[in-house]
Amino acid sequence: MSQQETHGFQTEVKQLLHLMIHSLYSNKEIFLRELVSNAADAADKLRYLALTNDALYEGDGELRVRISADKEKGTVTIEDNGVGMTRDGVIEHLGTIAKSGTADFFKNLSGESSKDSQLIGQFGVGFYSAFIVAKKVTVRTRAAGHKADEAVLWESEGEGNFTVDTITKASRGTEITLHLRDEEKEFADDWRLRSIITKYSDHISVPVEMWQEGTPESDGADGEKIPATEGQWKVMNKATALWMRSKADISDEEYQEFYKHISHDYTDALLWSHNRVEGKQEYTNLLYIPAKAPWDMWNRDRKHGLKLFVQRVFIMDDAEQFMPSYLRFVQGLIDSNDLPLNVSREILQDNHVTKAMRTGITKRVLGMLEKLAKDDAEKYQQFWAEFGQVLKEGPAEDFANRERIAGLLRFASTHTGSAAPTVSLDDYISRMKEGQTKIYYIVADSHEAAANSPHLELLRKKGIEVLLMSERIDEWLINHLTEYKEKQLHSVTRGDLELGELEDASEKEAQEKLEQESVALVERIKAALGSTVADVKVTSRLTDTPACVVAGEGEMSTQMIKLMQAAGQPVPEVKPTFEINPAHPLVSRLNDLQDEAAFADWSNLLLQQAQLSEKGSLADPSAFIKLMNQMLLANMK
């Protein structure tokens, strides 16, 4: 009895289909790669389920994908004998996009074909790519272990809805028929399909077959009869696990196609590493660094991790236990000989084999990046632009590899005069002044704010390089990266500059003299500002600016306070240390003021100017403007 229902597509699916139907892609043949890849995944999933329930094979354990075309009807059919789908599964998988953050993704689409094509490629369209070439798609599927009369028919023309009906299907698995649009009929040509399949399916580990027509009996050149042959399904690919083949036998093109198969990315990977590990643990890993960051890199619900195989049998996607979070951009797989075939995510969590493999794979990825940075600085900058902020999570997460991760970090610097983060900590150390023991840095809201900060004045004058940090994660990073190669990282906005041997005896003497001469001025300012500051000092870091504020040693920095406030965390009250530059004309004139009320106003004005320069904002900007206007009026009389 028919149980036909009509369902509306999820809003995001409608948007995606609109893009598919209106030919977003110049490379339309990718639909076949996506559908064959899905079919191969279905075979892998059945093989895994059958480990504990052999009856799911239903007497047919030869898993394969078959592709056929009917030129007269203008159809292409992709059929597998994999795990199949139930009615509920069909409605879920072929009517919605089960990805968190999907709505935000579609907001990012610009309407510009080239940009949107790249974004959609990062998003991954899977089954919906069928509508790039098809005016109508028909799916017939039966889930393994279900009765023949529990099969499902799904149909849609890619507009606003789809129909689902119950049918009878003798064989398990899924059969997808594409009814090609008139202008896409070339894909029903046998030779065209064969060329695409040969190009895209060699790396797939299940056989991909095409129908080869039989030939009638004919006469040979010498008059002998050539017997007729029957039509048969012919395997078009090598049908072996690519990662088990020798590296010498795999071309770059095959590696790139395999990357696209497992990642559903449309662009080539930046680099890869293929290794077999033998010893206490035996496993093979094939790891890829993508060229582009995924659109949902910062989504907390995003799944990441490697594909896990055990003795060539697919076990699970997104096995995050083998890769630390700061390397979540890495794609690839791991095939273990030591884990049990019935391994679960829970078993992986507290498994000594897993931990040893994670350690080895992490070192492998860091080694890949170190080699790239050494051999191809330009390509490494391309990597850094995409994934640098993620890598900065590493020192906090991975203490054992902290030094190696730190060596991979890149920063802007006063040495280059550019906002581009191209300077490594090793570069900085190689340029350190004689007698310099610290790596100086500043964290600010923007590169401009960092580069123009008054805290850099003395260091610039002395030619001492300062790393300029302005990404949100930098303050978090620096809290967990306090030294590198026995050189302490020191903030120029916190406590004393601690120049050590970089400050000669005459400079120290001049500083001490200035501090002694300014004792009375410092005390007057302290009295005027009262409890708004922790302390008032004569600066050792300013040359051209009248005053600045600094955080005390061990106190929370301005940037960390902002991070905590943005995260909704309670922040303790932090009072700044106010540093004055008595050599500046404004401060020297302030010292001459006899009117204590005017002195207090000017002191407050200088403090708020310094806070504005440091924080980029004030707690009460209206009061600051009112005070400044009052001072301007007083001086215009």
Curated annotation (Swiss-Prot):
This is Chaperone protein HtpG. It comes from Shewanella baltica (strain OS185). Molecular chaperone. Has ATPase activity. NCBIfam families: PRK05218.1. The lineage of its organism: Bacteria, Pseudomonadati, Pseudomonadota, Gammaproteobacteria, Alteromonadales. Residues 563-637 are annotated as: C. Residues 346-562 are annotated as: B. Its main location: cytoplasm. Homodimer. Keywords: ATP-binding, Chaperone, Cytoplasm, Nucleotide-binding, Stress response. Belongs to the heat shock protein 90 family.
